[in-house]
């Protein structure tokens, strides 16, 4: 049963990315997954239920990555927590590239589901990151920055490779699906945080980027 459910999820992610949610029928998903249409109704109560499952699954994993880093704040410096958090988010989205791309496309739509997502999940993300920044400022690790501007830039950098992979490959002639790209891109964001957030008069060597 778990295998059947996963086949439906994998088929839906692929089709929603290529044909769009509205352009994909339940029969399309069943055909791609090689299952009966009734299986989709049984597991997800239809296409809308499947959409909600995909979004919830993505966000539960996303928030788990952030919370795991946040829990280290008592043992690590705020700088190390931020680096760990950004690396974790990038790795999570890299490992779930198709789902990530679909999610951010849906996020651009003004729907009841997306408004609920903003309230439930992204409010938690804001809280965790804001607390880490406040901790870093209190301990003189971080500069005073506009949280709104910092988050706008950080989110843009974290999301861009997964939302526009064709642009990166076709125009910039790079390969965002390769691990090498992820490693180099992660280093670039860490260097941006060093310039933007970390106190310039404090010596700090970024943790070495691990091979992911």
Task: Mark where each language-model region is.
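Generic hydrophobic, amphipathic alpha-helix propensity
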Residues: 4-13, 29, 54-62, 129
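Short, structured helix-loop boundary elements
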Residues: 5-6, 26, 48, 52, ...
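Helix-turn-helix
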Residues: 7, 15-49, 53-54
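Hydrophobic alpha-helical connector segments
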Residues: 18, 68-99, 139, 147-154, ...
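Short secondary-structure transition hinges
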Residues: 49, 90-128, 149, 174-183
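Phosphate/oxyanion-binding loops and surfaces in catalytic or ligand/nucleic-acid-binding neighborhoods
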Residues: 57, 61, 92, 96, ...
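Amphipathic alpha-helical packing segments from all-alpha helical-bundle domains
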Residues: 60-67, 80, 112-138, 163, ...
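Hydrophobic/aromatic-rich alpha-helical bundle segments in the mid-to-C-terminal region
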Residues: 101-102, 115, 134-189, 203-212
């Amino acid at each position: 049963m778990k295998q059947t459910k996963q086949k439906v999820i994998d088929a839906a992610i692929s089709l929603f990315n290529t044909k769009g949610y509205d352009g994909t029928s339940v029969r399309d998903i069943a055909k791609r997954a090689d299952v009966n249409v009734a299986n989709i109704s049984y597991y997800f109560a239809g296409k809308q239920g499947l959409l909600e499952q995909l979004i919830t699954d993505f966000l539960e994993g996303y928030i788990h990555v952030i919370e795991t880093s946040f829990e280290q704040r008592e043992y690590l410096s705020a700088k190390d927590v931020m680096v760990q958090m950004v690396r974790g988010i990038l790795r999570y989205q890299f490992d779930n590239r198709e789902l990530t791309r679909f999610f951010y496309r849906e996020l651009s739509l003004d729907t009841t589901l997306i408004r609920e997502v903003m309230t439930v999940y992204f409010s938690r993300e804001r809280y965790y990151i804001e607390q880490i920044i406040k901790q870093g400022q209190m301990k003189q690790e971080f500069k005073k920055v506009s949280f709104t501007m910092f988050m706008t830039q950080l989110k843009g950098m974290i999301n861009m490779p997964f939302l526009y992979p064709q642009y990166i490959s076709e125009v910039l002639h790079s390969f965002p699906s390769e691990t090498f790209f992820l490693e180099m891109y992660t280093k670039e964001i860490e260097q941006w945080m060093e310039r933007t957030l970390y106190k310039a008069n404090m010596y700090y060597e970024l943790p070495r980027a691990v091979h992911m």
